[in-house]
Amino acid sequence: MKRIVLTTGGTGGHVFPALAVAHEIKNRFPQCEILFIGGKGPEREMVERAGISFKGLPAKGVLGGGIKKVFSSLWIVSAMIMALKEIASFKPDAVIGFGGYAGFCPVLAAWLLGVPTAIHEQNSVPGVTNRILGKVVKRVFASFEDRNGSFPAAKTVVVGNPVRKEIIDSGNCADTKTVLVFGGSQGAAAINDAVIDGLAKLKEAGISLRHQTGKADFEKVRKGYEQNGMDTGKVSPFIHNMGEAYAEASLVVCRAGASTVFEVAAAGKPAIFIPFPHATHDHQTGNARSLADLGAAELIPQAELGGNRLADEIIKLIADQDRLKGMGSKALSFARTDAASAIAEGVGDIIRMKTVRGAA
């Protein structure tokens, strides 16, 4: 394995699993050259911070548009031309897509050029681009069982969702009154507002918070903490060391993207999930139920979310450390900490398959 392209974009939920696989590939093959092809969003900073080369392509989501709208979108023409040039120039042994519209053209370009391809589908309900690509790639890696037959069974392997090593190593349930709050890499206004509204109750209960707000809401949330006499030093737009943040928390309040759900499980943390209600096919609710049905998490629909409801739920759980530890153990039972390794090994398999056929 000499050269690999990883491709996705949009949010940390897509990018972090790809980076976990990149880390695993570099551990196995230190001389392997990795190129990350993404969109024009926050992925460039995340990827370059990890020391990986990055190329950007135009990409734009077409939520609810279906397959026809993907192919009729204006950006796809220039993105395909650029992707074909990048793949032809880099000459990778394989290209792995991790979902999102930014990852569509590079995988399709690689397939057209005869390069071995694979995708990873992280959600319980596949997105439109992966449903298209699943028909042509050599291997489909899935986080959840494909109950809807979205992908050909013969080439689909359930591996879980790759999780960053620092989160896997963060340890189990901490016996503290610290709650980690985040709404994904870009924040979540509904969660931020509910936390602010419940701060007085949380302060009275002696609960401390570490809060990732996203850039847009940072000042508003910081002022809310300040006005309630809460520590603003633990409020930030983005938490770079999530392993440390998970390690010090005894409870997590968050959205339910697949990356988040599998991170929470790998860290062995009980959670209160507040699924994003406008996610495609409401996949976040399906993701959250995977842990809630095990008794590892609570689920609050955003329509029912408010400061009092959230604060009361946090206080009730923090007061019962035995229950929290039980929830954390159940979360760990769901975790798939070998997902990155399974994907790296699977990609090696499809490269070897091409090599054998080429030599025949």
From Swiss-Prot:
The protein's Enzyme Commission number: 2.4.1.227
Keywords, in A-Z order: Cell cycle, Cell division, Cell inner membrane, Cell membrane, Cell shape, Cell wall biogenesis/degradation, Glycosyltransferase, Membrane, Peptidoglycan synthesis, Transferase
Primary location: membrane
Pfam families, per database record: Glyco_tran_28_C (PF04101), Glyco_transf_28 (PF03033)
This protein's GO CC annotations: plasma membrane
Gene Ontology MF terms: UDP-N-acetyl-D-glucosamine:N-acetylmuramoyl-L-alanyl-D-glutamyl-meso-2,6-diaminopimelyl-D-alanyl-D-alanine-diphosphoundecaprenol 4-beta-N-acetylglucosaminlytransferase activity; undecaprenyldiphospho-muramoylpentapeptide beta-N-acetylglucosaminyltransferase activity
Annotated pathway: Cell wall biogenesis; peptidoglycan biosynthesis
Biological-process GO terms, alphabetical: carbohydrate metabolic process; cell division; cell wall organization; lipid glycosylation; peptidoglycan biosynthetic process; regulation of cell shape
Matches recorded under HAMAP family: MurG
Purpose of the protein: Cell wall formation. Catalyzes the transfer of a GlcNAc subunit on undecaprenyl-pyrophosphoryl-MurNAc-pentapeptide (lipid intermediate I) to form undecaprenyl-pyrophosphoryl-MurNAc-(pentapeptide)GlcNAc (lipid intermediate II).
Protein name: UDP-N-acetylglucosamine--N-acetylmuramyl-(pentapeptide) pyrophosphoryl-undecaprenol N-acetylglucosamine transferase
Provenance organism: Maridesulfovibrio salexigens (strain ATCC 14822 / DSM 2638 / NCIMB 8403 / VKM B-1763) (Desulfovibrio salexigens)
